[in-house]
C-alpha cells in the first residue's frame, strides 16, 4: 500500500517566484492498483512522483509505503522499493553496456553488495525468459550494446528493468517521446507487466485515451490537489469528451494540453 498524507510542497517559498506544486495532497493506493494520472501543465503530477521517489523533500505531510514512513528516507534507499520510468527513453539504461549487463544491474538494485561471479548462466536464462515477454527479439541479442537499440526498444527494456524486483511502479509520461505505434506497443507491454506481476502503479499521462483505457482508477490533479478520482463502472463508461467536460466543471478552466485533445 502507498499512502500520501496531507503532503504540500512549495518551490521558491517567500519569493515572487513562489509556486505551490502540492497543496495538502491525500492519496491511498491499495496493493495492485493501477492508477492513471492526468492534469494540466503545472498541476503537480511530476512533483507528486518526485515526492514519492524522494527526488524532492516535501514541506509538510507524510508518505507511507507498506506501513513504513519513508518521508525522510533518502532517494537511493527508496530504490529498493520503487521502480521509475521517465519520459526520455535514454535515461533508464546504460548505452555502453550490454542488454544482459543492464538487466543484471537492475536485478541487483537495493540488494546487499557481495563478491560474486558476475552474470551466472541461471541469471542469463532468467533474463532471456523475461525479455521474451517484450516480444521484440531482444532475447536473441543479449550481448548487444543498448545504445544500438531504438527508442522504443530501450523504453521497453527500461520498463522491464524497473519491474524486475516487483516494486511499486512510477511511470512519468513514459510513452510521450515515442511515435504513436511504438507508444501503443509500450503501453500494451506496460499493462501486461503490471497485471502479471500485480504491481501497484502510478502512471502520469497526457493521453486521455490511455488514461481511460488502462488501469482500474483515474485521477485528475489541479493546483496540487486531486479534483477527480474515478474508478469502476464510472471509469469504464468515460469518453475523452466526458473527461474534458468533467475537468472544466471541477476546475473552471479548459484543459490546456493539445496532446490530450488529439489523443
Language-model features: locations:
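A short, flexible loop at the N-terminus of ABC-type nucleotide-binding domains that lies
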Residues: 1, 10-24, 74
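ABC ATPase NBD coupling module
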Residues: 15, 69-83, 91, 113-120, ...
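The feature captures the beta-strand-to-loop junction immediately N-terminal to the Walker
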Residues: 38-40
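Helix-to-loop junction immediately C-terminal to a conserved catalytic motif
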Residues: 53
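Conserved ABC transporter NBD signature motif
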Residues: 61-69, 228-230
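Q-loop/switch helix immediately C-terminal to the Walker
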Residues: 96-109
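H-loop/switch region of ABC-family ATPase nucleotide-binding domains
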Residues: 205-206
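Conserved beta-strand-loop-alpha-helix hinge in the C-terminal portion
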Residues: 225-251
Amino acid at each position: 500500500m502507498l499512502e500520501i498524507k496531507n503532503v504540500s510542497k512549495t518551490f521558491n517559498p517567500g519569493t515572487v517566484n513562489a509556486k505551490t506544486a502540492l497543496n495538502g495532497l491525500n492519496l491511498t493506493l491499495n496493493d495492485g492498483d493501477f492508477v492513471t494520472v492526468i492534469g494540466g501543465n503545472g498541476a503537480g503530477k511530476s512533483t507528486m512522483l518526485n515526492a514519492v521517489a524522494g527526488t524532492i523533500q516535501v514541506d509538510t505531510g507524510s508518505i507511507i509505503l507498506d506501513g513504513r514512513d519513508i518521508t525522510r528516507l533518502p532517494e537511493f534507499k527508496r530504490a529498493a522499493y520503487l521502480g521509475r520510468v521517465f519520459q526520455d527513453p535514454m535515461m533508464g539504461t546504460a548505452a555502453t553496456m550490454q542488454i544482459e549487463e543492464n538487466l543484471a544491474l537492475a536485478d541487483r538494485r537495493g540488494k546487499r553488495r557481495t563478491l560474486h561471479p558476475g552474470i551466472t548462466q541461471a541469471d542469463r536464462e532468467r533474463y532471456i525468459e523475461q525479455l521474451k515477454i517484450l516480444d521484440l527479439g531482444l532475447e536473441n541479442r543479449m550481448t548487444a550494446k543498448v545504445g544500438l537499440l531504438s527508442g522504443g526498444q530501450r523504453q521497453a527494456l527500461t520498463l522491464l528493468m524497473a519491474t524486475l524486483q516487483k516494486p511499486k511502479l512510477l511511470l512519468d509520461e513514459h510513452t510521450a517521446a515515442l511515435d504513436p505505434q511504438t507508444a501503443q506497443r509500450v503501453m500494451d507491454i506496460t499493462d501486461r507487466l503490471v497485471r502479471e506481476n500485480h504491481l501497484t502503479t502510478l502512471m502520469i499521462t497526457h493521453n486521455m485515451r490511455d488514461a481511460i483505457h488502462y488501469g482500474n482508477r483515474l485521477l485528475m490533479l489541479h493546483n496540487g490537489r486531486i479534483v477527480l478520482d474515478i474508478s469502476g463502472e464510472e471509469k469504464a463508461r468515460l469518453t475523452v469528451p466526458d473527461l474534458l467536460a468533467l475537468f472544466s466543471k471541477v476546475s473552471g478552466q479548459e484543459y490546456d494540453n493539445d496532446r490530450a485533445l488529439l489523443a
